[in-house]
Amino acid sequence: MIKVGVVGASGYTGLELVKMLITHPGFELTYLATTQGDTTIEALHPSLEGVVTLEVEKADVNAVADACELVFLALPHKASMGFAKGLIEKGVKVVDLSADYRLELDTYEAHYCEHEDKEHLDESVYALIEYYREELKEAELAAGPGCYPTATLLGILPFIPYIDTSAPLFVDAKSGVSGAGKKLSETTHFVTVNDNIFAYNPLKHRHAPEIAEKIEKVHGAKMNVNFVPHLIPATRGELVSVYATLKEDIDPLEVLRKHYANDRFIRIREKPVDIKSTAGTHFCDIYAAKNGHALFVSSAIDNLLRGASSQALAAANLMCGYDEGMGLPVIPYMP
């Protein structure tokens, strides 16, 4: 058993990691921490009372290194890089769920802040599993993709060779409220969200440059990504619709089937996808259709799992020599 820990256990992605790790056949959960201070897991997540007996400590690099061979950092952006640097230098493998290691330096500093660990940023592997599987097997530091980029890229990347990359790419995305995190805000207040839907940060969201950067990384194509996210009155789930211009005649579903023929956690659907069918799972469901030169691609994921925690666990599996799917959730929350 490989000893692992979670730093940032108080949030929703931390909770999902704990839930998967306590039943994982290859990992032993030996360390839980937050940046706020010592507490108990039931104080953070009452649903885990009687299930997890570990105390939750105040995060400390030396304590993590003593207890763990691999650690998940479920921390806010800008907070992870200080921990990751010290842990890697002590020989601990790191899977980071924040944005701190997922972008090129110029892109990160343009949209977040000055980076304090440029050395390890250059060494990180982007943990979009289907595209960086082999690199992750050798990685010491995996950088979890954003939830919206995960759904968007898994949907559109197979089509980049067939679309006009000089034309704008339009991405319409909708996410459940858990995507905004656990911290209270007016935007996520029940009265604001219930019976409502609204866009936020239209054409200015930080996931747009991530999507554009990774399209260029995989296919060498520079695209103008117009990204508009929306908040919907659902707890979890994410639906992304992408609109592009085809430059040749294709069968969209056949393109998807061939591209993902060996990827067991991608499901190609014959009908438009929905968020409930992937809730509680690591699956990404994808549907596509065309009308002349117009291409429509739609992807559905669980934003907390495939968009964050289960994708991080899949990366950890590969980093530790395990089967990619070990311990990943596959049974949806239905009904």
Swiss-Prot record:
Where does the record place the catalytic residues? C147
Q: Which residues form a coiled coil?
A: none
Any one GO CC term of this protein is: cytoplasm
Query: Which InterPro entries has this protein been placed in?
Result: AGPR_AS, AGPR_type-1, NAD(P)-bd_dom_sf, NAGSA_dehydrogenase, Semialdehyde_DH_NAD-bd
The EC code for this enzyme is 1.2.1.38
Q: Which GO terms describe its molecular function?
A: N-acetyl-gamma-glutamyl-phosphate reductase activity; NAD binding; NADP+ binding
The broad enzyme category this protein falls into is: oxidoreductase
Catalytic activity, as annotated: N-acetyl-L-glutamate 5-semialdehyde + phosphate + NADP(+) = N-acetyl-L-glutamyl 5-phosphate + NADPH + H(+)
Q: Which CDD domains match?
A: AGPR_1_C (cd23934), AGPR_1_N (cd17895)
Taxonomically, the superkingdom here is: Bacteria
**Keyword Cytoplasm listed:** yes
Q: Which GO terms describe its biological process?
A: L-arginine biosynthetic process
Q: Which UniProt keywords apply?
A: Amino-acid biosynthesis, Arginine biosynthesis, Cytoplasm, NADP, Oxidoreductase
Pathway annotation from the record:
Amino-acid biosynthesis; L-arginine biosynthesis; N(2)-acetyl-L-ornithine from L-glutamate: step 3/4
As for subcellular location, the record says: Cytoplasm
* Protein role: Catalyzes the NADPH-dependent reduction of N-acetyl-5-glutamyl phosphate to yield N-acetyl-L-glutamate 5-semialdehyde.
Return the similarity comment. Belongs to the NAGSA dehydrogenase family. Type 1 subfamily.
| Name assigned to this protein | N-acetyl-gamma-glutamyl-phosphate reductase
